[in-house]
Regions:
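Accessible peptide chain termini
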Residues: 1-2, 234
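Generic N-terminal initiation segments characterized by hydrophobic and/or small/turn-forming residues
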Residues: 2-3, 183
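Short glycine/proline/serine/threonine-rich loop/turn segments at secondary-structure transition edges
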Residues: 3-11
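Asp-box/BNR beta-propeller blade signature and adjacent active/binding-site loops
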Residues: 18-19, 23-234
Length: 234
């Protein structure tokens, strides 16, 4: 547990025995096989959460590592459930990580319990022109704790369809804005469900911000695509 991320573990097969007898062996890779040490950033039970899933990782212009993920408080199941978007921040290349932040959490919005205001499957993007960091996720309001994939319907308002929301940080991931709902800008009203592609987005050379998306169209068929902004996310 105390190993450094810079450490490596090397292994080499010297002999192989079958029925306690040394077998003929052809060495494919004569050099030692080296693996880096993996360090768990989040573990079941941390911060009172049953599970952490759907990670994404980005590096800011200052070299800060920002890792996002679902904070699944009650179990590891998908939305709809009590789920927030968590973020871990490291300024030393991943050796140590600061206390978890919550860029997106909806609590008891609209008078419904947190388990019917889940937000998750995040994607993160660093605008390399400004060092503004964006996190996008799907917010599901209501749905009676049914799986969001089948409980989001055509329309635009939060009582009928999942909402696409953003949060941004302009101080290298230390603090985060209130949720920014962009559903009206990017969703076709005929689609059943629109959400981001979990993981990370990119900044193109001309400054265009690009996030992967997925959506269920009017035929109930899942599709993949992108959404983009040419005005710094405005």
């Amino acid at each position: 547990p105390g190993a450094s991320l810079l450490d490596k573990v090397s292994a080499k097969i010297v002999t192989v025995k079958v029925d306690n007898k040394e077998a003929l062996m052809h060495t494919v890779s004569p050099e030692n096989i080296a693996h880096r040490v993996g360090v768990g950033v989040r573990h079941a039970g941390d911060d009172g959460s049953a599970a952490f899933r759907i990670p994404g990782l980005a590096t800011t212009n200052k070299g800060t590592l920002l890792g996002v993920y679902d904070v699944r408080y009650n179990s590891s199941v998908d939305l709809q459930e009590h789920v927030d978007v968590g973020l871990s921040r490291s300024v030393d290349g991943g050796k140590t990580w600061e206390k978890m932040r919550l860029p997106l959490a909806f609590g008891e919005t609209g008078g419904l319990p947190a388990a019917q205001n889940g937000v998750g499957d995040p994607s993160i993007l660093v605008d390399t022109k400004t060092n503004t960091t964006w996190v996008v996720a799907a917010w599901t309001h209501g749905m009676g704790n049914q799986r969001a994939w089948w409980s989001s319907y055509p329309g635009m308002d939060m009582n009928h369809t999942a909402q696409l929301v953003l949060s941004k940080s302009t101080d290298d991931g230390k603090t985060w804005s209130e949720p920014i709902n962009i559903t009206d800008q990017v969703k076709d009203p005929s689609w059943y469900f629109l959400l981001q592609g979990p993981g990370r987005g990119i900044t193109m050379q001309d400054g265009t911000l690009v996030f992967p998306i997925q959506f269920i169209d009017s035929t109930r068929v899942p599709n993949a695509g992108i959404m983009y902004s040419k005005d710094r996310g405005e």
